[in-house]
């Protein structure tokens, strides 16, 4: 699901072309109900790319390097779940399984618990954050889920606003 930030889709795109009122934006945002939003693992705002940046040389991680890291993380997950019926990756694992067997450090668990209380996360939301944190740890080639992995997963959990 990729909702626009406002009815016209131009809010925060840097062009200044959005003519939506604050009430329009609020009304539009409310269309995504709590239960629906709770089922979205990651909220990421992707800004408009300037035309000049499309051909610019970048020092960012290359697509081939990202592909390699994702492939390696998927291999780790396949090995992790080889004895768990019907599960081949973190997204398909039971949240309780990851909580019990996913290498979550005590600091990470404490941070997630504080965040769950402070953000009023549902059980589903708690486990989705945990699954994303486990995936971030896999991308970092870490055997354990640290508080930093949980903190990053929590940043993706919160809907962004412009």
Model feature map: region roles:
Residues 1-162:
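Basic, amphipathic alpha-helical bundle interface domains used for macromolecular binding and assembly
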């Amino acid at each position: 699901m990729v909702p626009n930030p406002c009815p016209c889709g131009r809010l925060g795109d840097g062009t200044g072309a959005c003519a939506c009122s604050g009430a329009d934006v609020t009304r539009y945002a409310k269309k995504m109900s709590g239960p629906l939003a709770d089922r979205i693992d990651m909220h990421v705002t992707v800004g408009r790319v300037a035309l000049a940046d499309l051909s610019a040389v970048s020092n960012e991680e290359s697509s081939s390097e990202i592909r390699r890291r994702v492939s390696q993380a998927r291999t780790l997950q396949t090995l992790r779940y080889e004895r768990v019926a019907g599960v081949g990756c973190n997204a398909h694992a039971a949240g309780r399984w990851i909580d019990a067997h996913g290498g979550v450090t005590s600091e990470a668990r404490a941070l997630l618990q504080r965040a769950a209380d402070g953000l009023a996360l549902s059980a589903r939301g708690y486990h989705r954050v945990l699954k994303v944190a486990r995936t971030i740890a896999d991308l970092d080639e870490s055997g354990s889920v640290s508080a930093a992995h949980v903190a990053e997963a929590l940043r993706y959990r919160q809907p962004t606003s412009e």
